[in-house]
């Protein structure tokens, strides 16, 4: 699963996830993309589950790019532990998703196959998504 090799600090504060995705909002590698229309947090496990679903559907047909990376640590205290005595340990990693962010891209397959594969991937993700094509300028 995806996670940073090393970070400057082990733990982060919760923060707020506001605004729109300024970077990573255009399809830049493949021909088709899966774009987030809602906001939320996607865990490394969810990113991997969606990738597997797409890869299995397209078989050896196309190339898939993952455009998000889980770089925010989420901590949790063990069960039945009293409050206090510091922040819990890092449990998992998430990517914060804003509306407009392209999550995955695909190339080398037909549009119909790409739509089907992205529909399978979208079912694994906690944010609402839409299918987008590369815009030719």
Swiss-Prot record:
The keyword Ribosomal protein applies. It comes from the Bacteria. InterPro entries: Ribosomal_uL16, Ribosomal_uL16_bact-type, Ribosomal_uL16_CS, Ribosomal_uL16_dom, Ribosomal_uL16_sf. One of its GO terms (biological process) is translation. The keyword Nucleus does not apply. Keywords: Ribonucleoprotein, Ribosomal protein, RNA-binding, rRNA-binding, tRNA-binding. Pfam families: Ribosomal_L16 (PF00252). One of its GO terms (molecular function) is rRNA binding. GO terms for cellular component: cytosolic large ribosomal subunit. Part of the 50S ribosomal subunit. Belongs to the universal ribosomal protein uL16 family. PANTHER family: 50S/60S RIBOSOMAL PROTEIN L16, LARGE RIBOSOMAL SUBUNIT PROTEIN UL16M. Binds 23S rRNA and is also seen to make contacts with the A and possibly P site tRNAs. HAMAP family: Ribosomal_uL16. This is Large ribosomal subunit protein uL16. The lineage of its organism: Bacteria, Pseudomonadati, Pseudomonadota, Gammaproteobacteria, Cellvibrionales.
